[in-house]
Protein backbone atom coordinates (compact mmCIF):
# COMPACT_ATOMS: atom_id res chain seq x y z
CA UNK A 1 0.00 0.00 0.00
CA UNK A 2 1.38 3.41 -1.00
CA UNK A 3 2.27 5.83 1.79
CA UNK A 4 0.48 9.18 1.92
CA UNK A 5 1.06 12.77 2.98
CA UNK A 6 -1.22 15.74 2.39
CA UNK A 7 -0.16 19.39 2.48
CA UNK A 8 -3.00 21.85 3.10
CA UNK A 9 -2.84 25.59 3.71
CA UNK A 10 -4.68 28.29 5.60
CA UNK A 11 -5.11 30.29 2.37
CA UNK A 12 -4.23 30.49 -1.29
CA UNK A 13 -0.63 31.40 -2.08
CA UNK A 14 0.66 30.31 1.32
CA UNK A 15 3.31 28.09 -0.28
CA UNK A 16 1.64 24.68 -0.58
CA UNK A 17 2.79 24.10 -4.17
CA UNK A 18 6.42 24.91 -3.49
CA UNK A 19 6.51 22.78 -0.34
CA UNK A 20 5.05 19.82 -2.24
CA UNK A 21 7.61 20.41 -5.01
CA UNK A 22 10.43 20.36 -2.47
CA UNK A 23 9.12 17.25 -0.71
CA UNK A 24 8.84 15.46 -4.06
CA UNK A 25 12.52 16.16 -4.78
CA UNK A 26 13.65 15.25 -1.24
CA UNK A 27 11.73 11.97 -1.48
CA UNK A 28 13.07 11.21 -4.96
CA UNK A 29 16.60 11.73 -3.65
CA UNK A 30 15.90 9.03 -1.07
CA UNK A 31 15.13 6.60 -3.89
CA UNK A 32 11.38 6.44 -3.25
CA UNK A 33 8.96 6.23 -6.20
CA UNK A 34 6.88 9.33 -5.46
CA UNK A 35 4.20 11.26 -7.35
CA UNK A 36 2.27 14.50 -6.72
CA UNK A 37 -1.51 14.81 -6.72
CA UNK A 38 -3.98 17.67 -6.60
CA UNK A 39 -7.60 16.71 -7.05
CA UNK A 40 -8.79 20.08 -8.31
CA UNK A 41 -6.74 23.05 -9.40
CA UNK A 42 -7.93 26.51 -10.46
CA UNK A 43 -5.32 28.14 -12.64
CA UNK A 44 -4.64 29.76 -16.00
CA UNK A 45 -1.16 28.26 -15.82
CA UNK A 46 -1.45 24.88 -17.51
CA UNK A 47 0.80 22.23 -19.01
CA UNK A 48 0.21 19.69 -21.77
CA UNK A 49 1.17 16.08 -21.05
CA UNK A 50 2.74 13.67 -23.54
CA UNK A 51 -0.67 12.31 -24.53
CA UNK A 52 -2.14 15.79 -25.07
CA UNK A 53 -3.91 16.18 -21.72
CA UNK A 54 -4.09 19.51 -19.89
CA UNK A 55 -3.13 19.77 -16.21
CA UNK A 56 -2.05 22.51 -13.83
CA UNK A 57 1.50 23.73 -14.33
CA UNK A 58 2.27 23.25 -10.63
CA UNK A 59 1.62 19.51 -10.85
CA UNK A 60 3.88 19.25 -13.92
CA UNK A 61 6.68 20.97 -11.99
CA UNK A 62 6.06 18.70 -8.99
CA UNK A 63 6.25 15.66 -11.27
CA UNK A 64 9.56 16.94 -12.62
CA UNK A 65 10.80 17.30 -9.05
CA UNK A 66 9.67 13.73 -8.38
CA UNK A 67 11.48 12.46 -11.47
CA UNK A 68 8.32 11.12 -13.11
CA UNK A 69 6.49 11.98 -16.33
CA UNK A 70 3.46 14.24 -15.73
CA UNK A 71 0.09 12.67 -16.47
CA UNK A 72 -3.55 13.70 -16.20
CA UNK A 73 -4.14 11.65 -13.04
CA UNK A 74 -1.92 14.03 -11.08
CA UNK A 75 -4.54 16.76 -11.56
CA UNK A 76 -7.81 15.15 -12.67
CA UNK A 77 -9.88 18.35 -12.43
CA UNK A 78 -8.52 21.66 -13.74
CA UNK A 79 -10.67 24.79 -13.53
CA UNK A 80 -9.86 27.68 -15.87
CA UNK A 81 -11.72 30.94 -15.15
CA UNK A 82 -13.23 32.42 -18.31
CA UNK A 83 -14.63 35.72 -17.07
CA UNK A 84 -18.33 36.21 -17.71
CA UNK A 85 -18.51 32.90 -19.56
CA UNK A 86 -17.91 31.06 -16.29
CA UNK A 87 -15.37 28.33 -15.63
CA UNK A 88 -13.89 25.87 -18.08
CA UNK A 89 -13.83 22.43 -16.47
CA UNK A 90 -11.04 20.20 -17.73
CA UNK A 91 -11.42 16.56 -16.64
CA UNK A 92 -8.60 14.08 -17.12
CA UNK A 93 -6.93 16.51 -19.47
CA UNK A 94 -9.86 17.25 -21.78
CA UNK A 95 -12.43 20.04 -21.80
CA UNK A 96 -15.58 18.72 -20.15
CA UNK A 97 -17.92 21.70 -19.79
CA UNK A 98 -18.02 25.46 -19.29
CA UNK A 99 -20.30 26.38 -16.38
CA UNK A 100 -20.98 29.30 -14.08
CA UNK A 101 -19.81 29.03 -10.48
CA UNK A 102 -23.27 28.00 -9.21
CA UNK A 103 -23.88 25.21 -11.73
CA UNK A 104 -20.35 23.94 -11.24
CA UNK A 105 -21.21 22.47 -7.84
CA UNK A 106 -23.94 20.32 -9.39
CA UNK A 107 -21.12 18.34 -11.01
CA UNK A 108 -19.63 17.24 -7.68
CA UNK A 109 -20.64 13.59 -7.95
CA UNK A 110 -19.20 13.19 -11.44
CA UNK A 111 -16.00 15.05 -10.58
CA UNK A 112 -15.50 13.10 -7.35
CA UNK A 113 -15.62 9.86 -9.34
CA UNK A 114 -12.85 11.21 -11.56
CA UNK A 115 -10.82 12.20 -8.51
CA UNK A 116 -11.07 8.76 -6.90
CA UNK A 117 -10.31 7.01 -10.21
CA UNK A 118 -7.10 9.01 -10.50
CA UNK A 119 -6.17 8.37 -6.88
CA UNK A 120 -6.63 4.64 -7.33
CA UNK A 121 -4.45 4.72 -10.46
CA UNK A 122 -1.61 6.63 -8.79
CA UNK A 123 -1.71 4.50 -5.64
CA UNK A 124 -1.08 1.42 -7.77
CA UNK A 125 1.76 3.02 -9.72
CA UNK A 126 3.73 4.70 -6.92
CA UNK A 127 5.07 3.98 -3.44
CA UNK A 128 4.38 7.44 -2.02
CA UNK A 129 1.78 10.07 -2.89
CA UNK A 130 2.20 13.71 -1.82
CA UNK A 131 -1.16 15.43 -2.06
CA UNK A 132 -1.75 19.16 -2.29
CA UNK A 133 -4.92 20.83 -1.10
CA UNK A 134 -6.43 23.98 -2.60
CA UNK A 135 -7.01 27.36 -1.02
CA UNK A 136 -8.17 26.81 2.55
CA UNK A 137 -9.92 23.65 3.80
CA UNK A 138 -11.90 25.79 6.28
CA UNK A 139 -14.32 27.32 3.77
CA UNK A 140 -17.19 25.99 5.86
CA UNK A 141 -19.82 27.21 3.40
CA UNK A 142 -18.38 24.80 0.83
CA UNK A 143 -17.53 21.75 2.95
CA UNK A 144 -20.36 19.65 1.55
CA UNK A 145 -19.13 20.39 -1.98
CA UNK A 146 -15.45 19.73 -1.25
CA UNK A 147 -13.52 17.36 -3.52
CA UNK A 148 -9.99 18.66 -2.96
CA UNK A 149 -9.21 19.17 0.74
CA UNK A 150 -10.65 17.23 3.69
CA UNK A 151 -12.76 15.07 1.37
CA UNK A 152 -9.56 13.66 -0.11
CA UNK A 153 -7.83 13.38 3.28
CA UNK A 154 -10.80 11.54 4.77
CA UNK A 155 -11.21 9.24 1.76
CA UNK A 156 -7.56 8.17 2.01
CA UNK A 157 -7.17 8.59 5.77
CA UNK A 158 -4.14 10.66 4.80
CA UNK A 159 -2.15 12.56 7.43
CA UNK A 160 -2.39 16.33 6.90
CA UNK A 161 0.25 18.99 7.53
CA UNK A 162 -1.12 22.53 7.60
CA UNK A 163 0.88 25.46 6.15
CA UNK A 164 0.40 29.04 7.33
CA UNK A 165 1.74 32.21 5.68
CA UNK A 166 3.25 34.52 8.31
CA UNK A 167 4.15 37.18 5.74
CA UNK A 168 0.46 38.14 5.49
CA UNK A 169 0.14 38.47 9.25
CA UNK A 170 -2.18 36.60 11.59
CA UNK A 171 -0.55 33.23 11.07
CA UNK A 172 -1.31 31.91 14.57
CA UNK A 173 -4.97 32.88 14.31
CA UNK A 174 -5.31 31.35 10.85
CA UNK A 175 -3.69 28.07 11.89
CA UNK A 176 -5.74 27.89 15.09
CA UNK A 177 -8.96 28.85 13.33
CA UNK A 178 -8.50 26.33 10.53
CA UNK A 179 -7.99 23.43 12.93
CA UNK A 180 -10.86 24.48 15.22
CA UNK A 181 -13.32 24.98 12.35
CA UNK A 182 -12.54 21.45 11.22
CA UNK A 183 -12.67 19.68 14.59
CA UNK A 184 -14.36 16.61 13.12
CA UNK A 185 -11.13 16.02 11.16
CA UNK A 186 -8.84 16.75 14.10
CA UNK A 187 -7.26 13.30 14.07
CA UNK A 188 -6.05 13.83 10.49
CA UNK A 189 -4.10 17.00 11.29
CA UNK A 190 -0.61 15.95 12.35
CA UNK A 191 1.28 19.23 12.55
CA UNK A 192 1.85 22.65 11.05
CA UNK A 193 4.49 24.64 9.17
CA UNK A 194 4.99 28.39 9.36
CA UNK A 195 6.05 29.66 5.93
CA UNK A 196 7.55 32.91 4.57
CA UNK A 197 9.16 34.08 7.81
CA UNK A 198 11.49 37.09 7.82
CA UNK A 199 13.70 37.39 10.87
CA UNK A 200 15.14 35.27 13.65
CA UNK A 201 13.10 32.18 14.45
CA UNK A 202 13.56 32.63 18.22
CA UNK A 203 11.10 35.53 18.06
CA UNK A 204 8.38 33.03 17.16
CA UNK A 205 9.13 30.52 19.89
CA UNK A 206 6.59 31.77 22.50
CA UNK A 207 3.80 31.86 19.91
CA UNK A 208 4.67 28.45 18.52
CA UNK A 209 4.70 26.91 21.99
CA UNK A 210 1.31 28.42 22.85
CA UNK A 211 -0.25 27.28 19.55
CA UNK A 212 1.10 23.75 20.01
CA UNK A 213 -0.63 23.64 23.40
CA UNK A 214 -3.90 25.06 22.07
CA UNK A 215 -4.32 22.69 19.13
CA UNK A 216 -2.20 19.78 20.42
CA UNK A 217 -0.22 19.64 17.16
CA UNK A 218 3.55 20.08 16.73
CA UNK A 219 5.29 22.73 14.69
CA UNK A 220 7.27 20.88 12.04
CA UNK A 221 9.34 23.83 10.91
CA UNK A 222 9.64 27.51 10.08
CA UNK A 223 10.49 28.18 6.43
CA UNK A 224 12.14 31.52 5.56
CA UNK A 225 10.72 33.96 3.04
CA UNK A 226 12.24 33.12 -0.35
CA UNK A 227 12.63 36.18 -2.57
CA UNK A 228 13.35 34.14 -5.67
CA UNK A 229 12.86 30.43 -6.23
CA UNK A 230 12.97 30.48 -10.04
CA UNK A 231 9.95 28.17 -9.99
CA UNK A 232 6.68 29.36 -11.50
CA UNK A 233 3.94 29.79 -8.91
CA UNK A 234 0.41 29.38 -10.24
CA UNK A 235 -0.96 31.78 -7.64
CA UNK A 236 1.90 34.22 -8.02
CA UNK A 237 0.98 36.03 -11.22
CA UNK A 238 0.47 39.34 -9.42
CA UNK A 239 3.84 38.88 -7.73
CA UNK A 240 5.60 37.82 -10.90
CA UNK A 241 4.32 40.62 -13.12
CA UNK A 242 6.66 43.25 -11.76
CA UNK A 243 9.30 45.51 -13.24
CA UNK A 244 12.56 43.65 -13.67
CA UNK A 245 14.32 46.57 -15.37
CA UNK A 246 15.64 47.80 -12.03
CA UNK A 247 17.39 44.50 -11.41
CA UNK A 248 19.55 44.57 -14.58
CA UNK A 249 19.82 48.22 -15.54
CA UNK A 250 22.82 47.70 -17.83
CA UNK A 251 21.44 44.81 -19.87
CA UNK A 252 21.37 45.85 -23.54
CA UNK A 253 18.17 44.11 -24.72
CA UNK A 254 14.88 45.31 -23.24
CA UNK A 255 11.84 43.03 -23.48
CA UNK A 256 8.31 44.09 -22.54
CA UNK A 257 5.53 41.52 -22.19
CA UNK A 258 2.08 43.10 -22.37
CA UNK A 259 0.37 42.73 -19.02
CA UNK A 260 -2.98 41.53 -20.32
CA UNK A 261 -6.02 41.35 -18.08
CA UNK A 262 -6.54 37.65 -18.86
CA UNK A 263 -2.90 36.67 -19.36
CA UNK A 264 -2.28 32.92 -19.37
CA UNK A 265 0.90 30.86 -19.24
CA UNK A 266 3.05 33.81 -18.21
CA UNK A 267 5.71 31.25 -17.32
CA UNK A 268 6.52 31.21 -21.07
CA UNK A 269 8.87 34.12 -20.48
CA UNK A 270 10.72 32.96 -17.36
CA UNK A 271 13.80 31.81 -19.33
CA UNK A 272 14.19 35.28 -20.86
CA UNK A 273 14.48 37.03 -17.54
CA UNK A 274 17.42 34.86 -16.48
CA UNK A 275 19.50 35.76 -19.53
CA UNK A 276 22.37 38.06 -18.48
CA UNK A 277 21.85 40.54 -21.30
CA UNK A 278 18.07 41.04 -21.10
CA UNK A 279 15.77 43.21 -19.02
CA UNK A 280 12.24 41.82 -18.78
CA UNK A 281 9.13 43.57 -17.55
CA UNK A 282 5.34 43.25 -17.80
CA UNK A 283 3.59 46.50 -18.63
CA UNK A 284 0.90 48.32 -20.60
CA UNK A 285 2.48 51.75 -20.15
CA UNK A 286 3.34 53.56 -23.37
CA UNK A 287 6.64 54.85 -22.00
CA UNK A 288 7.75 51.27 -21.32
CA UNK A 289 6.75 50.15 -24.81
CA UNK A 290 8.65 53.05 -26.39
CA UNK A 291 11.88 51.97 -24.69
CA UNK A 292 11.58 48.29 -25.67
CA UNK A 293 13.61 46.37 -28.23
CA UNK A 294 11.17 43.45 -28.17
CA UNK A 295 7.46 43.51 -27.30
CA UNK A 296 5.62 40.25 -26.70
CA UNK A 297 1.85 39.79 -26.66
CA UNK A 298 1.36 36.70 -24.47
CA UNK A 299 -1.37 34.09 -24.42
CA UNK A 300 -4.81 35.12 -23.21
CA UNK A 301 -7.76 33.23 -21.76
CA UNK A 302 -10.08 35.79 -23.39
CA UNK A 303 -8.47 36.96 -26.60
CA UNK A 304 -11.32 39.23 -27.69
CA UNK A 305 -11.51 40.97 -24.32
CA UNK A 306 -7.78 41.57 -24.13
CA UNK A 307 -7.72 42.81 -27.72
CA UNK A 308 -10.49 45.26 -26.83
CA UNK A 309 -8.40 46.42 -23.87
CA UNK A 310 -5.41 47.09 -26.13
CA UNK A 311 -7.66 49.06 -28.44
CA UNK A 312 -9.15 51.11 -25.59
CA UNK A 313 -5.65 51.98 -24.40
CA UNK A 314 -4.58 52.69 -28.01
CA UNK A 315 -1.78 50.18 -27.60
CA UNK A 316 -2.69 48.66 -30.96
CA UNK A 317 -1.78 51.99 -32.58
CA UNK A 318 1.45 52.16 -30.60
CA UNK A 319 2.40 48.65 -31.73
CA UNK A 320 1.82 49.52 -35.38
CA UNK A 321 3.98 52.63 -35.03
CA UNK A 322 6.75 50.76 -33.23
CA UNK A 323 6.71 47.96 -35.80
CA UNK A 324 7.35 50.56 -38.53
CA UNK A 325 10.31 51.82 -36.50
CA UNK A 326 11.91 48.37 -36.31
CA UNK A 327 10.83 47.18 -32.86
CA UNK A 328 10.38 43.40 -32.85
CA UNK A 329 6.79 42.39 -32.08
CA UNK A 330 6.04 38.79 -31.10
CA UNK A 331 2.69 37.11 -30.47
CA UNK A 332 2.32 33.84 -28.57
CA UNK A 333 -0.95 31.89 -28.97
CA UNK A 334 -3.69 34.46 -28.24
CA UNK A 335 -1.13 37.18 -28.93
CA UNK A 336 -0.50 35.60 -32.34
CA UNK A 337 -4.23 35.71 -33.06
CA UNK A 338 -4.41 39.38 -32.05
CA UNK A 339 -1.60 40.34 -34.44
CA UNK A 340 -3.61 39.10 -37.42
CA UNK A 341 -6.11 40.96 -39.57
CA UNK A 342 -9.34 39.38 -38.33
CA UNK A 343 -10.64 37.12 -35.57
CA UNK A 344 -13.81 35.30 -36.62
CA UNK A 345 -15.98 33.53 -34.04
CA UNK A 346 -19.08 32.04 -35.73
CA UNK A 347 -19.77 29.69 -32.80
CA UNK A 348 -19.30 32.48 -30.20
CA UNK A 349 -16.59 30.46 -28.49
CA UNK A 350 -14.74 33.55 -27.23
CA UNK A 351 -17.28 36.33 -27.38
CA UNK A 352 -20.77 37.44 -28.36
CA UNK A 353 -19.05 39.22 -31.25
CA UNK A 354 -18.80 37.08 -34.36
CA UNK A 355 -15.99 39.09 -35.91
CA UNK A 356 -13.32 41.43 -34.60
CA UNK A 357 -10.52 43.31 -36.34
CA UNK A 358 -7.03 42.35 -35.26
CA UNK A 359 -4.03 44.61 -34.90
CA UNK A 360 -3.20 43.96 -38.55
CA UNK A 361 0.54 43.35 -38.35
CA UNK A 362 0.40 39.80 -39.72
CA UNK A 363 -1.43 38.69 -42.92
CA UNK A 364 -3.50 35.99 -41.23
CA UNK A 365 -7.06 35.41 -40.03
CA UNK A 366 -8.16 33.24 -37.11
CA UNK A 367 -11.35 31.19 -37.05
CA UNK A 368 -12.50 29.97 -33.63
CA UNK A 369 -13.94 26.48 -33.13
CA UNK A 370 -15.40 24.86 -29.98
CA UNK A 371 -12.78 22.08 -30.05
CA UNK A 372 -9.52 22.74 -28.26
CA UNK A 373 -6.15 21.68 -29.65
CA UNK A 374 -3.84 20.40 -26.89
CA UNK A 375 -0.57 18.76 -27.84
CA UNK A 376 3.14 18.77 -27.21
CA UNK A 377 5.23 19.77 -30.22
CA UNK A 378 8.81 19.56 -31.41
CA UNK A 379 10.40 21.07 -34.47
CA UNK A 380 12.77 23.67 -35.84
CA UNK A 381 12.97 27.23 -37.12
CA UNK A 382 12.38 27.05 -40.88
CA UNK A 383 14.95 29.74 -41.70
CA UNK A 384 17.59 28.07 -39.50
CA UNK A 385 16.80 24.35 -39.11
CA UNK A 386 19.67 23.89 -36.65
CA UNK A 387 17.61 25.85 -34.11
CA UNK A 388 15.42 23.21 -32.49
CA UNK A 389 12.35 23.92 -30.40
CA UNK A 390 9.96 22.06 -28.13
CA UNK A 391 6.78 23.28 -26.51
CA UNK A 392 3.05 22.77 -26.52
CA UNK A 393 -0.14 24.09 -28.09
CA UNK A 394 -3.33 24.88 -26.21
CA UNK A 395 -5.90 26.87 -28.17
CA UNK A 396 -9.32 26.80 -29.80
CA UNK A 397 -8.65 28.93 -32.88
CA UNK A 398 -7.10 27.91 -36.19
CA UNK A 399 -5.10 30.59 -37.95
CA UNK A 400 -5.05 30.70 -41.75
CA UNK A 401 -2.35 32.28 -43.91
CA UNK A 402 1.04 31.46 -45.41
CA UNK A 403 2.37 29.77 -42.29
CA UNK A 404 6.00 28.75 -42.19
CA UNK A 405 7.92 30.14 -39.23
CA UNK A 406 8.40 26.72 -37.62
CA UNK A 407 8.15 23.20 -38.97
CA UNK A 408 6.68 21.12 -36.17
CA UNK A 409 5.40 17.70 -35.27
CA UNK A 410 2.41 17.47 -32.96
CA UNK A 411 3.68 14.51 -31.01
CA UNK A 412 0.41 13.35 -29.45
CA UNK A 413 -1.40 13.71 -32.80
CA UNK A 414 1.37 12.28 -35.04
CA UNK A 415 0.93 15.27 -37.35
CA UNK A 416 3.62 17.33 -39.11
CA UNK A 417 2.82 20.86 -40.25
CA UNK A 418 3.98 24.48 -40.36
CA UNK A 419 3.25 26.88 -37.53
CA UNK A 420 3.49 30.63 -37.22
CA UNK A 421 4.37 33.39 -39.61
CA UNK A 422 6.97 36.13 -39.85
CA UNK A 423 6.44 39.46 -41.59
CA UNK A 424 9.52 41.67 -41.33
CA UNK A 425 10.16 42.29 -37.65
CA UNK A 426 6.78 40.89 -36.54
CA UNK A 427 6.11 37.21 -35.92
CA UNK A 428 3.65 34.97 -34.17
CA UNK A 429 3.29 31.34 -33.14
CA UNK A 430 0.89 29.08 -31.27
CA UNK A 431 3.71 27.36 -29.41
CA UNK A 432 4.01 27.91 -25.68
CA UNK A 433 7.37 27.20 -24.10
CA UNK A 434 9.54 28.07 -27.11
CA UNK A 435 11.82 30.27 -25.02
CA UNK A 436 12.88 27.18 -23.09
CA UNK A 437 14.83 26.37 -26.27
CA UNK A 438 18.34 27.62 -25.46
CA UNK A 439 19.34 28.11 -29.10
CA UNK A 440 16.15 29.99 -30.03
CA UNK A 441 16.51 32.29 -27.04
CA UNK A 442 20.09 33.14 -27.96
CA UNK A 443 19.13 33.58 -31.65
CA UNK A 444 16.51 36.13 -30.63
CA UNK A 445 18.74 38.10 -28.26
CA UNK A 446 21.84 38.05 -30.47
CA UNK A 447 20.01 39.69 -33.36
CA UNK A 448 19.37 42.67 -31.11
CA UNK A 449 22.93 42.69 -29.82
CA UNK A 450 24.22 42.93 -33.40
CA UNK A 451 21.67 45.65 -34.15
CA UNK A 452 23.17 47.68 -31.28
CA UNK A 453 26.74 47.11 -32.49
CA UNK A 454 27.51 44.43 -29.89
CA UNK A 455 29.11 41.07 -30.58
CA UNK A 456 26.79 38.06 -30.40
CA UNK A 457 27.25 35.64 -27.51
CA UNK A 458 27.74 32.03 -28.54
CA UNK A 459 26.88 30.53 -25.17
CA UNK A 460 23.39 30.28 -23.69
CA UNK A 461 22.72 28.64 -20.34
CA UNK A 462 20.76 25.40 -20.22
CA UNK A 463 17.25 26.22 -19.03
CA UNK A 464 16.65 22.56 -18.20
CA UNK A 465 19.70 22.44 -15.93
CA UNK A 466 18.84 25.79 -14.37
CA UNK A 467 15.32 24.56 -13.52
CA UNK A 468 16.83 21.48 -11.91
CA UNK A 469 19.13 23.66 -9.83
CA UNK A 470 16.15 25.78 -8.72
CA UNK A 471 14.31 22.68 -7.55
CA UNK A 472 17.40 21.34 -5.77
CA UNK A 473 17.96 24.67 -4.01
CA UNK A 474 14.32 24.82 -2.91
CA UNK A 475 14.46 21.22 -1.67
CA UNK A 476 17.64 21.90 0.30
CA UNK A 477 16.09 24.98 1.92
CA UNK A 478 12.90 23.15 2.90
CA UNK A 479 14.78 20.11 4.21
CA UNK A 480 17.07 22.35 6.26
CA UNK A 481 14.16 24.18 7.90
CA UNK A 482 11.76 21.28 8.55
CA UNK A 483 11.97 18.47 11.06
CA UNK A 484 12.15 16.19 8.05
CA UNK A 485 12.49 12.97 10.03
CA UNK A 486 9.28 13.76 11.87
CA UNK A 487 7.59 14.52 8.54
CA UNK A 488 8.60 11.09 7.25
CA UNK A 489 7.41 9.50 10.48
CA UNK A 490 4.00 11.16 9.98
CA UNK A 491 3.90 9.78 6.42
CA UNK A 492 4.82 6.31 7.64
CA UNK A 493 8.10 6.18 5.72
UniProtKB/Swiss-Prot annotation:
Catalyzes amidations at positions B, D, E, and G on adenosylcobyrinic A,C-diamide. NH(2) groups are provided by glutamine, and one molecule of ATP is hydrogenolyzed for each amidation. This is Cobyric acid synthase. It comes from the Bacteria. Belongs to the CobB/CobQ family. CobQ subfamily. Keywords: Cobalamin biosynthesis, Glutamine amidotransferase. The lineage of its organism: Bacteria, Pseudomonadati, Nitrospirota, Thermodesulfovibrionia, Thermodesulfovibrionales. Residues 252-440 form the GATase cobBQ-type domain. The active site is at 333 (nucleophile), 432.
